[in-house]
């Protein structure tokens, strides 16, 4: 089972937030097609500019993931310097992992998030704009709301 991430573009200068969608949504599904079907049932759409719902200058609010975009946890995220990677690991219970590939500019560390909640909490705190900032939809029907510690 994989998790597919849908990150909302603030088309028109605002995010749509309700009890189904928010800034970032993570959906557990067998494949991208199933995740897209679930996303559409939550109110996401893919043609907002063409349909006149989204700002043509800002772009579409939502984009579909690629078929190979699914995340499996534990999930290695990053390309950080060692100090920043260590700080993230300490704050979110993640693990430090040296990159297997060549580093770029000394950014040779990944952060290994063990759970979707750890990953989404990090993203909410690092890039959060909304309350809540993330929803996680599990295949078993559970929904978890993620709140940024920085958004009041």
Kindly give the residue locations of the regions a language model identified.
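Short aromatic-glycine-(Arg/Gly/Cys) micro-motifs in beta-strand/loop hairpins
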Residues: 1-22
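A generic structural signal for ordered secondary structure
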Residues: 3, 26-28, 143
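Short, flexible N-terminal segments of the mature chain
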Residues: 16-43
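Short, mixed-charge low-complexity intrinsically disordered segments
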Residues: 41-152
């Amino acid at each position: 089972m994989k998790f597919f991430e849908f990150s909302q573009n603030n088309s028109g200068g605002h995010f749509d937030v309700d009890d189904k969608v928010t800034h970032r949504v993570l959906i557990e599904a067998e494949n991208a097609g199933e995740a897209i079907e679930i996303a559409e049932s939550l109110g996401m759409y893919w043609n907002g500019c063409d349909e006149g719902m989204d700002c043509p200058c800002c772009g579409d609010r939502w984009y579909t993931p690629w078929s190979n975009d699914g995340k499996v946890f534990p999930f290695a995220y990053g390309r950080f310097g060692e100090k920043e990677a260590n700080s993230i690991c300490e704050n979110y219970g993640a693990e430090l992992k040296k990159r297997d590939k060549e580093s770029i500019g000394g950014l040779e560390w990944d952060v290994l998030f063990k759970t979707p909640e750890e990953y989404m909490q990090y993203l909410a705190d690092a890039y959060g704009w909304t309350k809540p900032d993330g929803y996680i939809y599990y295949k078993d029907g559970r929904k978890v709301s993620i709140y940024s510690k920085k958004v009041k």
